[in-house]
């Protein structure tokens, strides 16, 4: 990828010296997206309970890096997010991601980086895989409304991962499936995460450099830690997620974490999502000097 600043985004360059795959273009931040989204909330361990990541919580192509960083789950509120981006700089696409909660990474003999991280993520667009500092995998998404004439109809969502090294063949079995049931009693209400005090909800995501593992799906290795603050605003409604896989599971525990979430989640019928330019960090979690920044 180019290490020269983009004409449309002066001063911004991508956090890698590797070439972008042929046929794709760099889509530099900021990204402003219109979407529909569902948030499923994993259980939050109490202070005296063990802090253990569920099976399938870490991307297998990044596991060696996670081991090197001694990645540790330390608790706190996480999310499973299903998102249908109607507009984006790389076109419409779907996304499934998992944020376990707070993670701690040992970045040096006397340094750590701690905070929220996306550790599993699937998208339906190779262009989205290419443009990100997150371990994205390609997948096919199915969303089915039970009653097209009912605006509060439950939706069945299933995600089928791409076969290894393929961008056109997908597993016949889903790694995640759920029935999403909007509340009929509780009306929509406005929510802007930017207005929520950080001591209640710190939305910053801390993402490690990506392994260039030769997966064949367009993922490009990166070289810098970065942090980004995603901004959500729009109308929200309470919803109730139900498992659709065998044995009452949401995720299969291999391709996606097997968690039993809270019985109540959030549905964003219309959401405005903003991804501002990330801040590149040193091993102490501090922003690098302006002249050394590489953002994506």
Predicted regions and their residues:
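Short N-terminal edge-element motif at the start of the domain
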Residues: 45-118, 124-133
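Aromatic-acidic/polar surface patches that form glycan- and anion
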Residues: 40-42, 89, 262
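Short, extreme N-terminal leader segments that mark the start of a protein/domain
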Residues: 2-71
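Alpha-helical context
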Residues: 16, 20, 72, 76, ...
């Amino acid at each position: 990828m180019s290490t020269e600043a983009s004409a449309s985004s002066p001063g911004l360059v991508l956090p890698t010296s590797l070439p972008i795959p042929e046929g794709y273009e760099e889509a530099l931040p900021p990204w402003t997206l219109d979407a529909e989204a569902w948030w499923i909330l994993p259980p939050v361990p109490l202070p005296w309970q063990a802090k253990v990541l569920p099976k399938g919580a870490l991307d297998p192509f990044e596991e060696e890096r996670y081991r090197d960083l001694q990645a540790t789950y330390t608790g706190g509120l996480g999310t499973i997010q299903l998102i249908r981006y109607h507009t984006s700089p790389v076109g419409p696409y779907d996304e499934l991601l998992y944020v376990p909660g707070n993670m701690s990474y040992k970045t040096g003999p006397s340094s750590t980086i701690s905070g929220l991280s996306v550790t599993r993520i699937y998208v339906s667009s190779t262009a989205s895989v290419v443009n990100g500092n997150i371990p994205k995998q390609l997948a096919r998404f199915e969303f089915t409304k039970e009653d097209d004439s009912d605006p509060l109809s439950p939706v069945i969502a299933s995600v089928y991962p791409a076969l290894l090294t393929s961008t056109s063949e997908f597993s016949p079995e889903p790694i995640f499936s759920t029935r999403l049931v909007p509340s009929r009693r509780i009306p929509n209400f406005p929510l802007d995460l930017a207005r929520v005090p950080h001591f209640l909800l710190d939305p910053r995501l801390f993402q490690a450099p990506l392994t260039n593992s030769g997966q064949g799906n367009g993922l490009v290795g990166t070289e810098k830690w970065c942090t980004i603050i995603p901004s959500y605003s729009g109308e929200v409604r309470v919803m109730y997620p139900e498992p659709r896989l065998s044995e009452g599971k949401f995720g299969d525990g291999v391709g996606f974490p097997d968690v039993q979430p809270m019985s109540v989640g959030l549905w964003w019928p219309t959401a405005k999502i903003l991804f501002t330019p990330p801040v590149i960090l040193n091993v102490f979690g501090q922003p690098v000097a302006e002249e050394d920044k590489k953002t994506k």
